[in-house]
Amino acid sequence: MTLPSKENFSEWYHEVIQTAEIMDVRYPVKGLYVWFPFGFKIRQLVYSKLREIMDREHDEVYFPALIPETELGKEGEHIKGFEDEVYWITHGGLTPLDVKLALRPTSETAMYPMFRLWVRNHADLPLKVYQIVNTFRYETKHTRPLIRLREITSFKEAHTVHKDFEEAAEHVKKAIGFYKEFYDFLAIPYMVIRRPEWDKFPGAAYTIAFDTIMPDGRTLQIGTVHHLADNFARTFDIKYEAPNGEHYYAHQTCYGISERCIAALISVHGDDLGLVLPFEVAPVQIVIIPILYKGKEEAVMEACRKLAEKLKAFRVVLDEGEDRPGAKYYKWELKGVPIRFEIGPRDAEKGVAVVSFRDEKRKFEVPLDEVDEGKVLEWARELKQRLRNAAAERMAEKVKFVENTGEIEEWGGVVAVYLCSDEDCGHSVEEHGKSLLGWFEEVPDWLDLEPEGKCVVCGREGRLAALAKTY
């Protein structure tokens, strides 16, 4: 079967998730999905990079999934942001519980009572930990795999504790750097945006978000970084003794990424044939397809096996199945395999293979004695750069700068405007059918716009902001 055109993005996305065996959507509970082995391998490869980045400065931990109602409700502003989405456990077997237990919607209220016990003295700071866990939200909106879920299966949340606001603010900048490195690794362009006051994380001093633009022009939030100031420290009594003997409330940050990063990977790079994966995160990096003719099978298979052996440092599949070559091409294109070799009888005789890359239509011959690990890694680097450039170009085409509010509603993608910090002006632009994502912390290099200008509403000094329909 062929996939729907990616121009019909919603239909394409649901079809590719199932057909390419990322997630099985047939689980009998709305908003819960099953990882196929192939999809889970992508998850492992993507998250191994995230772990590598986090492990440089953080220790990995694991906190329980059950949070007592007494703790969840302590930070009033925080729980207000989640209370209608919490799953509650009210019974242990048939016995009603004295205190209801929440299935974690996020882990601040699970972790911070323990941080109070761990942080006593300035020598305990900074504290930097992370975990990769599942979280639960009773989503009432339209659910879709990897994007809007009732069980987020792969939530990487980091939490840090610092001596003061300034040190925590410096760490926010570091966290932004971690996420930039991660998304650059995946060749996914992004916008780093400071959320409006009315859309920041409940209980935060401010929120910085990473947004990418999906093929239908809507934006997907793919990471957030929050400066919590001392708000949670006051609620959970997280204090430290300074060198002068005085006790002070700590300041905190938290930042998270979910499997939306994989939704972005699939959506940003994929095409009408299926997945297009960067080399590092492809479960199968190289496929070798023998083109067999009667009587010439042995020579072809010998050449294919030698090549597979030569490249065994990579994740290589020699497809010896009985399908015709065309069916094999279709299968491995759907799976996003970055590099394909074909060897037929004439190729084996000449000592060459025909090479093609998943992101390009062209094929070319290469002498088999020139194919080695170095050559493959060179191709992989070039492929990633092409993916990055193509994605940035497509994303830039979906952003339109406007100088009057009347144009906001007409544009199907992201609208860039200059906007002052006045809340009335912020709400005013939202009356035109799009949400205010916030203000660019930095203008991405793929967007050719100045960072400052006159507010589109009131004419005062403003900064570049983005409006969009969101997932």
UniProtKB/Swiss-Prot annotation:
Enzyme class per UniProt: ligase
Give the record's keywords alphabetically.
Answer: Aminoacyl-tRNA synthetase, ATP-binding, Cytoplasm, Ligase, Nucleotide-binding, Protein biosynthesis
One MF annotation (Gene Ontology) recorded for this entry:
ATP binding
InterPro entries referenced in this protein's UniProt entry, alphabetically: aa-tRNA-synt_IIb, aa-tRNA-synth_II, aa-tRNA-synth_II/BPL/LPL, Anticodon-bd, Anticodon-bd_dom_sf, Pro-tRNA-ligase_IIa, Pro-tRNA-ligase_IIa_arc-type, Pro-tRNA_ligase_II_C
**Catalyzed reactions:** tRNA(Pro) + L-proline + ATP = L-prolyl-tRNA(Pro) + AMP + diphosphate
Q: Anything noted about its domains?
A: Consists of three domains: the N-terminal catalytic domain, the anticodon-binding domain and the C-terminal extension.
Its quaternary organisation is: Homodimer.
The identity of this protein, by name, is Proline--tRNA ligase
Species name: Archaeoglobus fulgidus (strain ATCC 49558 / DSM 4304 / JCM 9628 / NBRC 100126 / VC-16)
